[in-house]
Amino acid sequence: MSAKEVKFGVDARDRMLRGVEILNNAVKVTLGPKGRNVVLDKSYGAPRITKDGVTVAKEIELEDKFENMGAQMVREVASKSADAAGDGTTTATVLAAAIVKEGAKSVAAGMNPMDLKRGIDLAVEAVVADLVRNSKKVTSNEEIAQVGTISSNGDTEIGKFLADAMKKVGNEGVITVEEAKSLETELEIVEGMQFDRGYISPYFVTNADKMRVEMEDAYVLINEKKLSQLNELLPLLEAVVQSGKPLVIIAEDVEGEALATLVVNRLRGGLKVAAVKAPGFGDRRKAMLQDIAILTGGQAISEDLGIKLENVTLAMLGRAKKVMIDKENTTIVSGAGKKADIEARVNQIKAQIEETTSDYDREKLQERLAKLAGGVAVIRVGGATEVEVKERKDRVDDAMHATRAAVEEGIVPGGGVALLRASEQLKRIKTANDDQKTGVEIVRKALSAPARQIAINAGEDGSIIVGKILEKEQYSYGFDSQTGEYVNLISKGIIDPTKVVRAAIQNAASVAALLITTEAMVAELPKKNAAAPAMPGGGMGGMDF
């Protein structure tokens, strides 16, 4: 075990505070509409330019072990805010640094760190309650666009794209952000349920120009096992031919005699048919097939349920207004499933999302939810250079998470004003002793830090701006740093999602309170490089001539 270095008390807190300050100074310059960019050097490829607080924070690693501990703890604040709300990472970092700085002074003055922490916790509870009380529900598409614009640093085009995407796929729909190959940013909506499996044989193609299978008002057979012989299916196929409707077969695989027979029938025109492999693997495949069954109003044919292929009737098949299959994807539009059944399935998946601890599982469940609930929107971000595309994609990601958060918990005035207004409520908090009161006061001072920093980044005097905002009692009155005017922020569209602001203060206070109560720090001593062994002497040792 290597030797350790231990620091105590003021010395430990000072070193830690220095690390917090370094990280905060790098991150805070990105805050607000007039925030600056940060350039990150990469070990390979071009440097990355970003205005995203958490991306900057994740790059910071300090040489001094004790300073680095402070920086890493605050980096955790940014990461947690990104996980919880997807935005507000810079605000959270600025708040944490402000609380740590004030808290360290109070501890140095001899106050009880545990009472300070209790005071901080009381203050945060009051702030969260105030935010929730003043939160305004998002009702219009315009407000969603405003949230997107603010979170993407004033880019109205991004705000508009996000509002359109949310309108088309609904609040539960999935919005994915990709890099485009062109200069333009574009939005593509995939309606209905799409999964990443294409046709098994190109002979099923109906539209030769686009190499695509297009079927209107089709039956859908959902089978969990492989199909290699068609004997069991003949009665069903005859019934489908009689109905004159096309048939889509989704199965683990279709091969051999079964595939050959289907292709021959398709080419002769007797049966309009196409076969697709089932999506996913293992238990996830079973779940996805069940989703398709519920969406199309059919039954998944599975031997687990005691249903055999020879007993399948037309009534057990799903129906869809349109099915499109290309080489890589299958899209089912307007399935005939009952609305109540689909809603029940959606609620079941939501419950699974709440319970799961795996990020991968959560992502897959959210994809399934979107496919059932609304559809998928893809925003392809364009730009002149790779560096520009990456920077813009960062902002679109932030804005996307912010718009979701706004729909979830509503909005409050932006520009750090919601926290400033909440700070006024803290004067009324009753505490058990003076040290707890100081803890509340630490948070009260820290709550002005984001508004102050936004003003500083816009080239204004932060203290004067904060003072003027607090003079007026109107809740949404604040400073528009883009134009340099005092306005009603909500009617001007300068708004923040309540969830983002709430997550920022909760995460900042949680980590900052722990840093304040730190009394000792332990870090590994740097290893001393052992001296290189001496080179052997010249000549041939041990040989006498």
From Swiss-Prot:
Statement: the UniProt record of this protein carries the keyword NAD: no
GO molecular function: ATP binding; ATP-dependent protein folding chaperone; isomerase activity; unfolded protein binding
Biological process terms in GO annotation: protein refolding
Cellular compartments per GO CC: cytoplasm
Enzyme class name: isomerase
InterPro entries according to UniProt: Chaperonin_Cpn60_CS, Cpn60/GroEL, Cpn60/GroEL/TCP-1, GroEL-like_apical_dom_sf, GROEL-like_equatorial_sf, TCP-1-like_intermed_sf
Pfam families: Cpn60_TCP1
UniProt EC number: 5.6.1.7
Keyword Disulfide bond part of the UniProt annotation: no
Catalytic activity: ATP + H2O + a folded polypeptide = ADP + phosphate + an unfolded polypeptide
Residues engaged in binding ATP: 30-33, 51, 87-91, 415, 496
Keyword tags: ATP-binding, Chaperone, Cytoplasm, Isomerase, Nucleotide-binding
CDD domains (UniProt xref): GroEL
SUPFAM superfamilies (UniProt xref): GroEL apical domain-like, GroEL equatorial domain-like, GroEL-intermediate domain like
Domain of life of the organism encoding this protein: Bacteria
Subcellular location: Cytoplasm
Signal sequence extent: none
Assembly behavior: Forms a cylinder of 14 subunits composed of two heptameric rings stacked back-to-back. Interacts with the co-chaperonin GroES.
Family assignment from sequence similarity: Belongs to the chaperonin (HSP60) family.
Function: Together with its co-chaperonin GroES, plays an essential role in assisting protein folding. The GroEL-GroES system forms a nano-cage that allows encapsulation of the non-native substrate proteins and provides a physical environment optimized to promote and accelerate protein folding.
Protein name: Chaperonin GroEL 1
Species this protein is from: Nitrobacter hamburgensis (strain DSM 10229 / NCIMB 13809 / X14)
Lineage of the species this protein comes from: Bacteria, Pseudomonadati, Pseudomonadota, Alphaproteobacteria, Hyphomicrobiales
Encoding gene (name): groEL1
